[in-house]
Amino acid sequence: MDALEKSLCDFTGSTPLDQRFRSLFTIKGLAATSDQHMQRAISIISQAFSDDSALLKHELAYVLGQLEDARALPTLKKILQDLSQDAMVRHEAAEAMGAISDPSVLPILEQYRSDSDVSVRETCELAISKISFDNSEEGQALKQSKAQAKLAEEQSGLGGVESAFKPIDPAPAMTPAASKEAARSQADGVRYDASHVPLFQSTLLDTNLSLFERYRAMFALRNVAHGGGDGAIQAVLALARGLQDGSALFRHEICFVFGELCHPASIPSMLHVLNDTKEHEMVRHEAAEALGGIVEEGEHAANDSANDYTRVLDTLNKWAHDMDAPRVVRESCIVALDELAYNNDPTQFHRIETSTPVAA
């Protein structure tokens, strides 16, 4: 991992940001291969928080959460407590604690539930709710069911909706029938389709409900969209309606979901968000990164999406070079352009994990 550490922790500016992102996610992949690599990965990623890029540090916190290892908690706690850090970074640290879901972090999350920044407050609220859910009877049943389903998928070589989304969500997807029985069967066979969109949309847009319940509806709509067909477009449009919500955190998560889905129907919404200079930079950054994954020219050209590709490319280039734009927006566009280029021409560069020998 020495070469990866050198790349990720290059604070001189000589290593391009997009290359450092590739190094980060290569480290994330290697972490899963052994406990030794996991410890080394956590150590390297923790060192990288010395960088001055809020975008990179936000991504570092995200990855630490996705590693789902309690040894990352000291670093995440330190970041959340550091009021000099950008709120976007602190929010991601709190969300990462929720992903790891260790009840020992509940006191610090409760403390920062009254933080001066609303995105940090809301994230702490979500993380507390997720940890509570994970340790409830329903959450434990869901965890067991998913573990059994994962084992069955590994044995059969098949996978369903849940296996398509490996990231740990900040809230479990709502089921068509919110019950313990539904939770137990979710990983085994709950089918999300167009008939569920009205219920999920209603929950998503109901500001009288908790943020956690609305997030659950958000990820349920994602699962509907992943199923394809008419339900996919309906679900994407339902999610897009959530972009009118008053919470920047909520809007940014919808953009993240669009990035997971890579559905062409979300392109107009993401372009609108990125071009809206009055929108919160956290939301614009997520829209930019979502656009980087949505369009693959060769795949979609036959579906009359060439114009979409051109618009996305032009818009990302515009904001990547606009020195008056917030730094996190510019850098997100740079990373998105790198992803877009790779998706369309894998021969233009070799990913660092295949071109650079990795020494543990």
Curated annotation (Swiss-Prot):
GO cellular component, one term: cytoplasm
Subcellular location: Cytoplasm; Nucleus
Organism superkingdom: Eukaryota
HEAT-like PBS-type repeat residues: 56-82, 89-115, 213-245
Catalytic function, reaction form: [eIF5A protein]-deoxyhypusine + AH2 + O2 = [eIF5A protein]-hypusine + A + H2O
Enzyme Commission number, as recorded: 1.14.99.29
Pfam families: HEAT_2 (PF13646)
Residues the record lists as binding Fe cation 2: H252, E253, H285, E286
GO molecular function, one term: metal ion binding
Keywords assigned: Cytoplasm, Hypusine biosynthesis, Iron, Metal-binding, Monooxygenase, Nucleus, Oxidoreductase, Repeat
SMART domains: EZ_HEAT (SM00567)
Cofactor(s) of this protein: Fe(2+)
Gene3D superfamilies in the cross-refs: Leucine-rich Repeat Variant
Pathway entry: Protein modification; eIF5A hypusination
Keyword Manganese part of the UniProt annotation: no
Cofactor binding summary note: Binds 2 Fe(2+) ions per subunit.
Matches recorded under InterPro entries: ARM-like, ARM-type_fold, Deoxyhypusine_hydroxylase, PBS_lyase_HEAT
Positions contributing to Fe cation 1 binding: H58, E59, H91, E92
Claim: Transcription is one of the keywords in the record: no
SUPFAM superfamilies: ARM repeat (SSF48371)
Role, per record: Catalyzes the hydroxylation of the N(6)-(4-aminobutyl)-L-lysine intermediate to form hypusine, an essential post-translational modification only found in mature eIF-5A factor.
UniProt record similarity statement: Belongs to the deoxyhypusine hydroxylase family.
The protein's name in its UniProt record: Deoxyhypusine hydroxylase
Organism: Mycosarcoma maydis (Corn smut fungus)
